């Protein structure tokens, strides 16, 4: 789908604003957007957010045969998916020139700069090596795509741990995470990317441009640096006419940014490690989504203390009957609660009397009774259906109506003092149906 | 390059050809001026550049590879030569990207067929088989730099030139542990106290006297021609790629391959006439090449481009 | 073997700041509008320029000319035989860089809705392939008579122990040596192409950049002489 082009008046306004040093998100020309970095509950996953740009990266490893040219080096494969979800101009399943550029840059940063020790990924020289695969998915695009993707990929690689292996004479033993702790990858340094936009033949520098700003600029350059004050990549994104002094200036800006972001990445990884070693279940990506959802409510689970029934006859032969509701038990599962046949009528009569006595304390106000009876009907219908599915007898099915502030105290239809005979028989019928 | 000519021009051309007169003054069996230069590239084991009529330009480069193969898996002895023709985009915009792949594959396949009995034809090619399971693989790669008709002819001349320029190192084969063999370059000691690495390696050359040649013979009107220019190629009825090899025992020529290029109808007599024309032209070409290869002085590699 | 020997010479006998011999020939290709054969020592590059001609609908730009570049190497150009002459990632990346560089140099506003094709073929690659392609393309464009801001010249520079070396050969282009390919217009401080390979420490950045800029200026002098000579040789045809 074609994205409508930027209108001329929008372009002029943005350019004018940039020339006077103002931007639409109230940043300075040399100010970066805030970066949010979250690692997932699965090892080797990370989401990075810069402003509105969101990228997720996941790392996995597999054992493979090495190429004959490099028999003792592991392989790193990078895959990028630019879906129409991020930007409607992207084609599904096809990488346009933008996608190819992104893959090329990621390969440059992760593979060519040798930030990962590939020789440690060798299991058996010439026969078995680890093939590490980095999958990068772009979720949303708003400028600085390369920065975000690189950060997500680097964090995921830092977070990833591959299974531990031992070499036996005739085979390789791979341990699961429960037997031996997985081993993290050996990463020498972390290259961090910065996109720097250029305006006015390179006279002005606009850092971290958004999508709209990038469409108005003359060109942009991407610089990747690491904490060791090395430049890992100088990538020319578009055509540009610059002086060498300006290039050096851009590199210096990128360098300071790299140092700050490296600290952030290390922090996030350390915090996650702390949580995991304290056996706390990691939050994963759930903290990225705000929990304000209006369309569902929560209802507290309530446990019913069901009374014990006295057996009159043959206590040895019969099991202790406990018509308790097992909370969190799936009532739909077959054979979850097995009960024996007991004499129904006497049992029912006894139960009724007991319930009536305990229910007596509950005040059911009149205006609610109509609503209650409606709900009662619904409950009956639901109970009918559930009983039909249930195999075992005497199993009580707990049905709660969501959204109600006061869940019903009993599952059975509300029994009033003057219980109809009909009700009882209908209830009995229900039971007999099973 | 796509040449468009009008119907009147076509008529003029066809009627002239039927009277054995072509637009540039040649007869039907004449080739355009051929410039052949060997040893053009220093990075290859053998190279040759051929220019036909100052427009068609083909560069051939040969690279040797030591290949290990499983003798039990192959029924017949596999040919040690493999051919690859690539149309460079310099020749025409239409060859950018994958544009020239189809034509290039067609010509490569034709060469593969023409050279398919090369182990019998070329006398010392069997020297490439070094030991059980090891042999030299001769990769012949051609790059078409300019295109103006008659590409297969130029390619075959370039191949002959490059093969005659090729120098294969002599090796010593000695048995090694584990049933393998060790292959070491032979450096003949000529005396003196030079270090082992400084003694030049002994080389041997292929005998290309009876190397197969691929010629394009086209039919325009009722006449058969060789070496068509782009204008003539617009008027052809059909084209045959004929592979001709000199038979050393009998002073005659063997036909190693006949392939039709493009469409068109041909009668049986026409095919016979065309093969006769191909043999005759091949004879002339072989003589010319022999004379040239004998008299060529070794120049600085790559000098031909600067001329 | 170290790249710079103890006496200060490189493997082929040059000094660190010395470039290789440049040999050129223009107008080789009869079919193309402009063509150039350029040698940087053993690196041999052929460039052909077609256009400007009416572009295909998919590539048409309303206000300026579309530039399409293709970089390909012959299968026998490198040390080992390569199966695919073009289409792999590295070639596509270099093609893209050439496109971006020449979009800044060619006065594209003069030819709206047209297309200029630039095809580079590396016949023999011995280091500094991208720089050689940029130089060959500049001369081919001059041969084709396409209006430009100036002749672009390029050079590849590396750094060895704080000493910069210019015009690298393939033996010097190792995995550990950081190198920058820089292209400027007319030898001035206007950079149109910058490409970095391997990691470079920031303290060395300005050293490498200055060396590259100076080398580009030197290469430009050579290319300018070639262009002038070619023009003089063609002057009788132009009737001057």
Curated annotation (Swiss-Prot), chain C:
Keywords: Cytoplasm, Exosome, Nucleus, RNA-binding, rRNA processing. It is found in: Cytoplasm; Nucleus, Nucleolus; Nucleus; Nucleus, Nucleoplasm. SUPFAM superfamilies: Ribonuclease PH domain 2-like (SSF55666), Ribosomal protein S5 domain 2-like (SSF54211). The keyword rRNA processing applies. One of its GO terms (biological process) is U4 snRNA 3'-end processing. Disulfide bonds: none annotated. One of its GO terms (cellular component) is cytoplasmic exosome (RNase complex). CDD domains: RNase_PH_RRP41. The keyword Cytoplasm applies. Transmembrane segments: none annotated. One of its GO terms (molecular function) is RNA binding. Component of the RNA exosome complex. Belongs to the RNase PH family. Non-catalytic component of the RNA exosome complex which has 3'->5' exoribonuclease activity and participates in a multitude of cellular RNA processing and degradation events. This is Putative exosome complex component RRP41. It comes from Caenorhabditis briggsae. The lineage of its organism: Eukaryota, Metazoa, Ecdysozoa, Nematoda, Chromadorea. The gene is exos-4.1.
């Amino acid at each position: 789908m074609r994205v409508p082009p930027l209108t001329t008046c929008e372009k002029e306004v943005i350019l004018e604003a940039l020339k006077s040093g103002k931007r639409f998100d109230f940043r300075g020309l040399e100010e970066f957007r805030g970066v949010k970095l979250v690692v997932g509950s699965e090892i080797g996953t990370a989401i990075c957010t810069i402003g509105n740009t969101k990228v997720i990266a996941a790392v996995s490893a597999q054992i493979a045969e090495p190429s004959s040219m490099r028999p003792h080096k592991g392989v790193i494969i990078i895959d990028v998916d630019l879906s129409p979800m991020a930007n409607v101009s992207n084609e599904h399943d096809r990488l346009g020139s933008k996608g190819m550029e992104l893959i090329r840059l990621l390969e440059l940063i992760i593979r060519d700069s040798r930030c990962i020790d590939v020789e440690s990924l060798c299991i058996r020289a010439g026969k078995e090596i680890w093939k590490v695969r980095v999958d990068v998915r772009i979720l949303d695009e708003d400028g600085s795509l390369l920065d975000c993707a690189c950060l997500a990929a680097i964090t995921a690689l830092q977070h990833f741990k591959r299974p531990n292996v031992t070499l036996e004479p005739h085979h390789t033993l791979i341990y699961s995470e429960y037997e031996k702790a997985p081993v993290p990858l050996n990463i020498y340094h972390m290259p961090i990317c910065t996109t720097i936009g250029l305006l006015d033949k390179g006279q002005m520098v606009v850092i971290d441009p958004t999508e709209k700003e990038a469409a108005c600029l003359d060109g942009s350059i991407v610089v990747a640096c690491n904490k060791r004050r090395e430049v890992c990549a100088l990538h020319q994104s578009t055509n540009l006419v610059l002086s060498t002094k300006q290039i050096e200036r851009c590199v210096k800006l990128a360098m300071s940014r790299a140092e700050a972001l490296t600290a952030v990445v290390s922090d996030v990884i350390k915090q996650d490690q702390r949580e995991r070693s304290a056996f706390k279940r990691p939050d994963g990506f759930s903290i990225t989504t705000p929990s304000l959802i209006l369309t569902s409510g929560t209802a507290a689970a309530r446990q019913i203390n069901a009374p014990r029934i006295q057996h009159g006859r043959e206590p040895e032969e019969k099991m202790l009957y406990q018509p308790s509701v097992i909370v969190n038990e799936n009532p739909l599962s077959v054979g979850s609660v097995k009960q024996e046949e007991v004499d129904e009528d006497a049992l029912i009569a006894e139960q009724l009397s007991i319930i009536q006595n305990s229910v007596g304390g509950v005040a059911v106000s009149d205006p609610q009774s109509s609503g209650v009876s409606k709900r009662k009907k619904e409950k009956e219908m639901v109970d009918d259906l559930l009983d039909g599915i249930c195999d075992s007898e005497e199993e009580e099915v707990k049905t709660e109506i969501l959204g109600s502030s006061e869940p019903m105290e009993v599952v059975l239809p509300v029994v009033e003092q003057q219980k109809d005979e009909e009700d009882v028989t209908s209830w009995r019928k229900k039971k007999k149906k099973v | 390059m796509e040449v468009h000519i009008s119907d009147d021009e076509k008529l003029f051309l066809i009627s002239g050809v039927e009277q054995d007169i072509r637009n540039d003054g040649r007869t039907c069996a004449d080739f355009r001026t051929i410039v052949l230069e060997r040893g053009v590239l220093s990075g290859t084991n053998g190279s040759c550049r051929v220019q036909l009529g100052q427009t068609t330009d083909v560069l051939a480069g040969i690279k040797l590879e030591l290949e290990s193969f499983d003798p039990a898996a192959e029924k017949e002895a596999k040919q040690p030569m493999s051919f690859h023709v690539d149309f460079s985009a310099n020749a025409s915009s239409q060859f950018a990207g994958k544009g020239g792949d189809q034509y290039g594959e067609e010509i490569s396949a034709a060469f593969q067929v023409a050279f398919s009995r090369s182990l019998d034809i070329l006398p010392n090619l069997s020297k490439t088989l070094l030991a059980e399971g090891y042999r030299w693989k001769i990769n012949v790669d051609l790059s078409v730099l300019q295109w103006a008709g008659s590409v297969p002819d130029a390619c075959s001349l370039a191949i002959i030139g490059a093969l005659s320029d090729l120098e294969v190192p002599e090796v010593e084969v000695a048995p090694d542990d584990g049933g393998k063999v060790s292959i070491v370059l032979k450096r003949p000691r000529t005396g003196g106290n030079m270090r082992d690495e400084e003694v030049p390696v002994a080389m041997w050359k292929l005998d290309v006297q009876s190397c197969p040649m691929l010629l394009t013979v086209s039919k325009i009107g009722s006449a058969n021609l060789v070496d068509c220019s782009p204008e003539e190629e617009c008027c052809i009825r059909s084209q045959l790629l004929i592979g001709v090899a000199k038979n050393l025992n009998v002073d005659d020529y063997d036909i190693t391959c006949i392939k039709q290029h493009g469409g068109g109808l041909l009668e049986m007599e026409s095919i016979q006439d065309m093969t006769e024309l191909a043999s005759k032209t091949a004879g002339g070409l072989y003589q010319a090449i022999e004379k040239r290869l004998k008299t060529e002085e070794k120049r600085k590699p790559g000098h031909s481009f600067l001329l | 073997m170290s790249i710079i020997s103890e006496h200060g010479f490189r493997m082929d006998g040059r000094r660190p700041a010395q470039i290789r011999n440049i040999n050129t020939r223009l107008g080789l290709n009869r079919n193309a509008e402009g063509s150039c054969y350029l040698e940087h020592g053993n690196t041999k590059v052929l460039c052909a320029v077609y256009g400007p001609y009416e572009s295909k609908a998919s590539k048409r730009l309303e206000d300026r000319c579309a530039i399409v570049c293709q970089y390909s190497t012959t299968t026998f150009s490198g040390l080992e035989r390569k199966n695919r002459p073009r289409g792999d990632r590295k070639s596509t990346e270099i093609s893209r860089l050439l496109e971006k560089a020449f979009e800044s140099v060619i006065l594209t506003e003069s030819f709206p809705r047209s297309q200029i094709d630039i095809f580079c073929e590396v016949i023999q690659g011995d280091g500094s392939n991208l720089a050689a392609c940029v130089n060959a393309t500049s001369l081919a464009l001059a041969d084709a008579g396409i209006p430009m801001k100036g002749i672009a010249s390029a050079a590849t520079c590396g750094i060895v122990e704080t000493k910069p070396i210019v015009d690298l050969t393939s033996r010097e282009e190792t995995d550990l040596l950081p190198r920058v390919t820089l292209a400027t217009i007319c030898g001035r401080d206007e950079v149109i192409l910058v490409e970095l390979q391997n990691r470079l420490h920031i303290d060395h950045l300005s050293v490498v950049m200055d060396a590259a800029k100076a080398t580009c200026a030197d290469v430009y002098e050579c290319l300018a002489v070639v262009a002038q000579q070619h023009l003089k040789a063609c002057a009788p045809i132009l009737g001057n």
